[in-house]
Amino acid sequence: MYRRILCISANTFRETIRNKILYAILAFALMVIGLTFFLADLSVGDLARIIADIGLASIHVFGVIMAVFLGITLVNQEIDRKTIYLILSRPVRRFEFILGKTFGLSVTLGLTTAAMAVVLFLVHLGYRYGGRAEAGIFIASAGIYMELILLTSLATLFSTFTTSVLSAIFTLSLFIVGHVTNYLTTVGDRSKSAGLRIGSQVLYYLLPNLEHFNWKNDVVYGGIAPLPLLGWGLAYLVCYGGCVLCLSCLLFERKDFK
């Protein structure tokens, strides 16, 4: 089983890493991050802080674009090409296919995120000569990478039962909602309606809370996210992402390709 998952992961990595659109997005992202060096000179304030803020935001935005674009095509592309029949005709179970595809794309996103983080590190180093801020760039980028893995899992889930366009819409919607989930508890606490309070609590636990991976502010202000926060983010990814992948595998097992 593990060998088959690893084989599918390796093939997925090779396919995604050769994607010309991926290179176009990555090249544009690296260019924007590199230009933060010049944008900072046009701004008033702490130049190193501005570079870190714009740079990490660029990694985040372009990472999400790559995760959503590649994630929604993981399953639908194989179905459209009819290669899914060839793959499943071999001794490959459907859940192995989903896990292998997701893990392979996660490796690709890891390499692209690392590349963008290194460029930002070098640009930022021009203003701050080493220290906590530079280390924090990689930690914040790790948080972004965890978020991208979760978004990939969600995109894979949606692609098992709907079209690529709808998968992209649903995934981007959850990306936006995932960064305001914390406000649901605030709305519920302030409401006088018991139904609204219960509903807000249910939605709070059902919807993804992507703020668990948001460690950018610590870096912008010259610090590093505390260790318990990092551990909680990783635990949340494993638990929530694992549940999403299990649901994806369950839906894909029941999918009819005829």
How would you describe each model-predicted region?
Residues 30-74, 98-166, 182, 187, ...:
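Secretory targeting signals
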Residues 254-258:
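Short cytosolic juxtamembrane segments of multi-pass membrane proteins
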Residues 2, 35, 42-45, 49, ...:
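Terminal transmembrane helical anchor/hairpin motif
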Residues 9, 74-106, 252:
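Helix-loop-helix units of permease transmembrane domains in multi-pass membrane transporters
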Residues 24, 28, 99-100, 170-173:
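Hydrophobic core positions of alpha-helical segments in small-molecule transporters
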Residues 1-23:
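Aromatic- and glycine-rich beta-strand/loop motifs that create alpha-glucan
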Residues 64-71, 84, 119, 154, ...:
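Hydrophobic/aromatic residues in alpha-helical transmembrane segments
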Residues 15, 76, 87-89, 155, ...:
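Helix-capping/transition residues at the boundaries of transmembrane alpha-helices
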